[in-house]
Amino acid sequence: MNRNGRFGNLEIAASVKNLLKYLPGSYLQKFYRLPQKGNQHAKRFMLRFSCRPFRHLLIDVGIRAHLIPDSAYEDNYMEHLPRDGLCSKLKKHLNNARVTGINYYPGSKYFEIEFTHFYLAFDFYGVGNLILFQKPDNNLNSSDSIILETIED
């Protein structure tokens, strides 16, 4: 981990290896935006999957990604978090979506969770990005292939 607390290439590779152990075949159940303290550029999200014992994925976009054990967060705490536009959009497209794989490009600061019909990409360069891609089907119309949502304060 760098001095500023951001994941480097090795930490991302280790985190992806851990994700590959638990997430494939599980279902995304909930998507939360967690409240922020301090750093206004860090965006923190919690993804809850159906796999156990590590079913919570904590993502600080642009900073770090961790699988968290069930005991770390109480469900009743997360149920009272406010919903926002990004969470609603992701819930619309990824509600109960099955994880089919984790794609990682060695040496990069980028990985994506592959669902049945979408990719959820996490970029750890600079302030980071969270991008939802629709899987391309064999249609000629490519205008619907990317769904982008910007993360703003």
Feature-to-residue mapping (PLM):
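Acidic, proline/glycine-enriched N-terminal capping motif
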Residues: M1-D153
